[in-house]
Every structure is written in structure tokens, then in C-alpha cells.
Amino acid sequence: MVVAKPTAAVSIEDLIKKHSDVDPFLVKKWERIFSLFFDRNASHQVDWGDFYLVVKKVRDIYGAESVQTGFAKKSLAALWEGLCSIADADKDQLISIDEWIGLLKKTDAKTEPKWFKDYQNFMFKLFDVSCDGVMDLAEYTDGMSTYGFDQSECDAAFHKFSVDKKGQYVPQMKPETWNTYFHQLFYSTNKSDVGNHLFGIIDF
């Protein structure tokens, strides 16, 4: 296993300049996703160790023998292999922030790739502890705690995005709605789309 070595932090301003062909709002969102959900050891590169830290946290929260832990082990291993096969340009078993942005900007948002759909489905199933096909605030909060979010942050975010077309709060979210918001989070340049706040309220 290759272990990521700490590298100099890349500022968001530098990333925006380097990837000037991408909307700055998307670059900011992509960097946030990379830092919060993939680069768990803050090395500015993603390796299998980052994914293992997520599995370990899932185990701590849900239990070693839980459905969530077994699902996380299986799904994250497959996701890592999939990401490496298409994003790891220099084949060093490390995915840098530039490789991550490069992967996303060459992805056709209209035809989501397998790794994207796998990640989208993994996150919903991880959160849906009761396996009833819908997600509520308590499940969302437990899932987000895997990534270090506290209850107040989760409550604010869930009430922000779990709404109907009239803006009224909806206490449970279906997979179809989750998928729409997940797509908005990754690819929408419209700052008013509620999917931008799917993994915590953003203020940029």
C-alpha cells in the first residue's frame, strides 16, 4: 500500500487560476468534497488510508458487525479501485486534488460515470440505517457524524435541502431526490440550488 506523504497545501485561489476553464463555484465545491470526504488524513492527496479511516469511523459509530460497516468495507474498496483506474494519471496509487478536478471536469454531467453513481448510492445506503428506502434527519445526522459534522450543522443542512417545490420542509427524503441533489452538489453552477448544501451548508 502506498502511503500519502504530506504535501504543500494548495490554496483555492491557485486551484481556480490553474483550472480557469471551470466555473470557480464548481472548483470550490470540488475542493471541499475532496477535503471533507476523501482526504481524511489531510495529506492533500487521497490514498487507500483515507478510505480506511472512513470505514473505521463507520465501525465506531454503527458497530463492527453492523450492516453499515460491512457495506462500507465492500463499497469503498470498489470505489477506490474505480477512482484509481480513471483518476490516478501517474499510477502512483495516490489521487491529488488536481487529478480529482481533472476527473470531474472531463466527466459528462449528463451521463454520470459508474464511480459517481456508486458513490451516490453508497452515501444514501450508508445513511439509510433502517433500510426502509428513505432518509430522515436522525439517519442523516448519524451518517454525517462519520465525517465530523455535529448535530446542529446536520439539522441546519437537512432543513435547508429537504424541502418540496414550495420550500416546505419534508421530514423524509427519497433516493430520487437524493440523486437530484447529489448531482447538483457536484455539477450545478446555480448557487440557489439546495443540493449545494447536501453535505453541510456552504457560504461561498
Swiss-Prot record:
Ca(2+) 3 binds at residues 128, 130, 132, 139. Residues 25-61, 75-110, 115-150 form the EF-hand domain. It comes from the Eukaryota. Keywords: Calcium, Metal-binding, Repeat. Ca(2+) 2 binds at residues 88, 90, 92, 99. Ca(2+) 1 binds at residues 39, 41, 43, 45, 50. InterPro entries: EF-hand-dom_pair, EF_Hand_1_Ca_BS, EF_hand_dom. This is Calexcitin-1. It comes from Caenorhabditis elegans.
